[in-house]
Amino acid sequence: MSNVGVTDAPLLSMDEDLFSVKPYVTGLSSFINTCETPMTISIQGDWGSGKTSMMNMIKENMLDTVWPIWFNTWQFSQFRMGNGLAFSMIDVLIKGLGGKKNVLSTVAKGVLGFTRKVACVATDAVVGGEAAGMIRDVTTPTEDVDVAQEILRLKENFQKLVDEKLAKEKKNRVVIFVDDLDRLEPAKAVELLEILKLFLDCKNCVFILAVDYEVVTTGIREKYGDNVSAQKGRNFFDKIIQLPFKIPVAHYSVSKYVGDMMSKIGISVEGNDNELFTALIRTSIGFNPRAMKRLFNTYQLLDFVSRGTVMNIPNNI
C-alpha cells in the first residue's frame, strides 16, 4: 500500500510550485536584483499561507546573482532566550559573511548597548557557536559600553563584511531572509526588528522578512503599553518596511493541485467535478495550503475509519 497523507513541509524550489506562483517569484526576484539598496521587504500572510515556500523559491531563483543568508526564528521560538535570540541572529549574519570572532565581539557589544539589557542564556546548546561566548563576554558588568560608538563600529564592520563578501563571491548584493517572525511572541518579534534596524541602512543589502503587520502592532502594544496608538504601530512598521508583499492566497491557481490530490486519495474526477471540488474548497476553508492539506489528510483518515481498514492497534496501548 502506498503512503498516504500530505506533509506540511515548505517548498524548496519553483520546480515544486503547486499554485502557479512563478510570476510572483520572478517579479520579486527581478525587483530584488535591481532595486535601490538598502531595501526591506515583508512577506505577509496567515500561518500556512506559503510564506516560507515563497522565500525558498525566491532564494533558489536568485542564487546566481546574490549571496543569501537565512535565519529561521522558529528554531529558537520555543526557548525563553532573552537577548540570546538577537545574538544568535547576529551570529548567523556575521558568519554568513565570513566574519571572525573579533568582528562578532564588536557587533555583540553594539547590540548589548543598543538594547540596554543584560542577556542571560542558560546553555550553549540553545545558542551555540561563538555567539554563546560573546554573550558571556559582553554581559559582564566590568565594562562600560559607549552605545553610540559601538553602534557606529557595528555598522562600519557590517558594511565592510558585506563589501568584502560581494567582491569575493562576485555577487550583486546580500539578501538576508528572516523567517517565521510571526512564531515569536509579538513583543519579541518587535525587539528583533529593532535590532535589525541597526543593519537596514547598509548598501547592497536587501532584507526579506516573514512578518505580518498585525504581529508588529500587537508587539508594540505588549512592549510599550496599550496606550500606544495604532498609528504609532503603523509608523514603526512603515519605517522598517519599504515594500510589503501580501501572499496572494485568493489568487492561487489550485485546480491542478485539487485534481492531483483527489486522484491521490482515490476520488475519480470526471467532467466538471474538479471545478466543483475547487469551488467547495474556496467557499469553505479557502485556498490556504496548510488548511487544504489538513482537509485532505482528514478525509483520508475518515475514509480508513469508514472502511474499517485502520491498522490493528493493541488494546493495552
Stretches with model-predicted labels:
Residues 1-79, 84-87, 157, 161, ...:
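Walker A/P-loop-proximal flanking segment of P-loop NTPase domains
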Residues 47-49, 75-78, 212-217, 249-254, ...:
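Conserved nucleotide-binding/hydrolysis micro-motifs of P-loop NTPases
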Residues 55-167, 171:
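P-loop NTPase nucleotide-binding core
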Residues 57, 85-89, 191-193, 222-228, ...:
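Short secondary-structure boundary/capping segments
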Residues 146-214, 218, 223:
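Conserved Walker B catalytic segment
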Residues 216-239:
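Short regulatory helix/loop adjacent to the ATP-binding pocket of P-loop NTPases
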Residues 239-275, 285:
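Conserved small helical "lid"/interfacial subdomain of P-loop NTPases
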Residues 267-317:
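C-terminal helical "lid" subdomain and adjoining coupling/linker elements of P-loop NTPases
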